[in-house]
C-alpha cells in the first residue's frame, strides 16, 4: 500500500484543511444549519436499548465528512474488515488470524480459518464455562473443607486483567448472588499481599490467566497464591479445588498442580487486549452470571453486525475512526480523552488506553517502512464529574486541542433522591460539551462581569481570563442504560474504531513487539540485583540506579 501521505484522498483533505480549517467555527456551523444535530448524529436501536452518537460538535462539515469516507474507501477499509471477519491472517508479523469476533458470534454462522470452522471449538469452551459457573454460583463446587466459593481471584496482567476488571466493575449491579471478585496483576508484592489479607483459603478460587503459562508477573503471583493457600490446606491435592487455568499450555498447567479438566482453552487468534470475550472472561461470568456474560457477547455481536453491514458514512466505529484521523493527521492532536459520566465505567478509559495504544502505537507500516505521519493517540480519561474539578481546565482554556468522547447512560442504576443525583450528572454532561463547543465570547464575558458589579478597572483586568475560545471538538455517546448488552456494544464499537484507524495508517494493530524489549532487559538485570558488587555492564545511568538500589535496600528507616 502506498504511503498515506501520498494518497490522493489524503492530499485532497490536506489541501482543504490548509485552505479552510480556520473558517470551521462550531458556533457558526450550528447557526447556519438548525438541523446540524440531525445531519451529524446516529441513533442506533439495538432492540436492547438505544445508543446515540452525536458527532455534530466536531470540526467537520458534509464536505469534510465525504472526503474522510473517501479516504477510508481508498485505504481498503471495507476489504480489510471483510478479511478479518473471514478468518484471513491479517496479523502479518505473527502470521495469525484475528478472530475475537468469532468469540461473540451469536448468530453461530461458520467462520473458517485454514479450512476449518472455529465455531464448534468456541461453543465447546462457552458450554464448559457455563457449566462451571453454574456449579460455583450454586454452591455445588466445594473447597477442600466443603465450603462454597465466596471469592474469585483473577491473577493475570494486561489483556488477562484489564478487560475482566473493567467489565466486572461496570456490571456490578448485575452481580447479585455471585461471588466477590478480586484482580491481581502487578508484580509489586503489595498487590497480592493486600488482596490475600482479605481472603479465606477455604472459600477462595484462583483463576490463573496466562496463554503461555509462562508470563513472569502472573506465574510469580500464582506461585505466591499457591504457597499462601497450602500454608492452610497442607495437602497439594487440594489445589485442584481452588485453582483453575485460562491457558493453552496443558503441560505447564499440570506442572503447577491444576487439573487439566479445569483448564479453559483459548487460541492464538485471540489477542490479549481482545480476549475478554473468551475464557479470559471467566471471572466476569462467575461474578455476574453466565446469562449476563452471554448478553455482553450479544451486544458486541450486534455492533459487529452494524460494523459489517452499514455503509461507512452511517457506521459508528468508522465515523469515530475518521474523526480521530482528522484530528491526529490534520490538526496535529496527540491525545484523546474518554470521559464516562458513570462511576461504574471508571476503568473504561484505562481499558482502551491498552486497547488503542498497544494496537496503534506503532511507527512501522505493514511493509516495514517508517511512517512519515502520526499514528495512535495517547488515550486517557477519568469519570465525570471528577475530571471537571481536575483537568478540564486545560481542555477548556489550554493551548492544546484535546478531542473528547463524553459517554453517559440516560437511566441510572441508582435513582436515589428521586433521581436528583443523575439529573445533576446529566446536566453537567450536557453543559460541558456545549461549553467546549460555544465557549464564551469577550462580549458575553463583559456583560457577565458588568452584571456582577465589577468596576471598569476590575472588568478589564479579569476579562481575558473569562473568555473561552470554544471550538473544542467532542463526541457525545448517550445510551439508554449501562446493561451487559449495551456495554458489549460500546466495547466492540471502540475495538472496530481502533481497527479502522490501523488500516488507514497501514500498521498492524494486532501485534505488540514494543512490550518485549523491556521484558528481555529485565531478565538480564534481575540476577545483577543480587549481592553487593558494582554493576558496570550498562550505561552509566542504569549502572548508577542499580548501585543506589543496592546501597539503600538494607537501610533501616523508621
Curated annotation (Swiss-Prot):
Modified residues (N6-succinyllysine): 454
Residues with N6-malonyllysine modification: 454
Superkingdom classification of source: Eukaryota
Residues annotated with Phosphothreonine modification: 250
Reactions mediated catalytically: alpha-D-glucose 6-phosphate = beta-D-fructose 6-phosphate
Main localization category: cytoplasm
GO CC terms of this entry: ciliary membrane; cytosol; extracellular space; plasma membrane
SUPFAM superfamilies: SIS domain
PROSITE patterns the record matches: P_GLUCOSE_ISOMERASE_1 (PS00765), P_GLUCOSE_ISOMERASE_2 (PS00174), P_GLUCOSE_ISOMERASE_3 (PS51463)
Positions bearing N6-acetyllysine: 12, 142, 454
GO biological process terms held by the UniProt record: canonical glycolysis; erythrocyte homeostasis; fructose 6-phosphate metabolic process; gluconeogenesis; glucose 6-phosphate metabolic process; glucose homeostasis; glycolytic process; in utero embryonic development
Catalytic residues, chain numbering: 358 (proton donor), 389, 519
One family name in Pfam for this protein: PGI
MF terms in GO: carbohydrate derivative binding; cytokine activity; glucose-6-phosphate isomerase activity; growth factor activity; monosaccharide binding; ubiquitin protein ligase binding
Biochemical pathway: Carbohydrate degradation; glycolysis; D-glyceraldehyde 3-phosphate and glycerone phosphate from D-glucose: step 2/4
CDD domains in alphabetical order: SIS_PGI_1, SIS_PGI_2
Modified residues (Phosphoserine): 86, 107, 185, 455
Keyword set, alphabetical order: Acetylation, Cytokine, Cytoplasm, Gluconeogenesis, Glycolysis, Growth factor, Isomerase, Phosphoprotein, Secreted, Ubl conjugation
PANTHER family: GLUCOSE-6-PHOSPHATE ISOMERASE (PTHR11469:SF1)
Protein name (Swiss-Prot/TrEMBL): Glucose-6-phosphate isomerase
Organism name: Rattus norvegicus
